[in-house]
């Protein structure tokens, strides 16, 4: 297992019974995760400090129940990369933090090649909000970011500007 240990503003605090307790910056969120099939004691203090919990709807989608006022967006940092976080109506925050190990891997490859004078071009398809795009560009690659959703492309541009 590879760990993305460069997060400055993200951590999984706990997980139990299909839910993940995460801290994104200074906001604690509870989100569903079908991979979490075990049960542990949710009476720990961290669970009581959640700023928001995402509840799935039986008809699809879901909604956030907020216990404190969440900003529309805020930033988190992974190493020297910055990303905007926005809780959306389908549990996502705009970033898959577990992908950071992949960003590290290809960043090492890109840096090694560009240091030897080679130009690296990356085509990032289904690129979402640009986590991989930003990481590849920061490592020295020329990146073509492609996503069918205009809103995601705009968000990726925001993330690129942050980094």
PLM-predicted stretches and their roles:
Residues 1-4:
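N-terminal accessory targeting/assembly segments
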Residues 7-22, 29-97, 104:
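Non-catalytic substrate-recognition/targeting regions of SAM-dependent transferases
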Residues 27-28, 142:
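Structural motif
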Residues 107-163:
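Conserved SAM/SAH cofactor-binding pocket of Class I
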Residues 21-24, 122:
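Short, surface-exposed loop and linker segments with low hydrophobicity and enrichment for Pro/Ser/Thr
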